[in-house]
């Protein structure tokens, strides 16, 4: 599954553009999840880097009981290899 479509890339506000907006008012643009676990990444901002990778900012819950706002790169999400040949998925009901 393509995690970032062209439509999503265009919809993502640049990094730091919503830093004056309270966390509870930020709009989730795309949500990623582990289909075999409880990890989720609710992304609100992102910027493409010179190497073609994306730095994404959002609410990250790694399933350890301590969700937090933070950064993840698209490459990091794409490199997560799960059993049965699966990987991180994009929630098609968001955006």
List each language-model region with its residue ranges.
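Catalytic phosphate/metal-binding cores of nucleic-acid and nucleotide-processing enzymes, i.e., regions
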Residues: 1-95
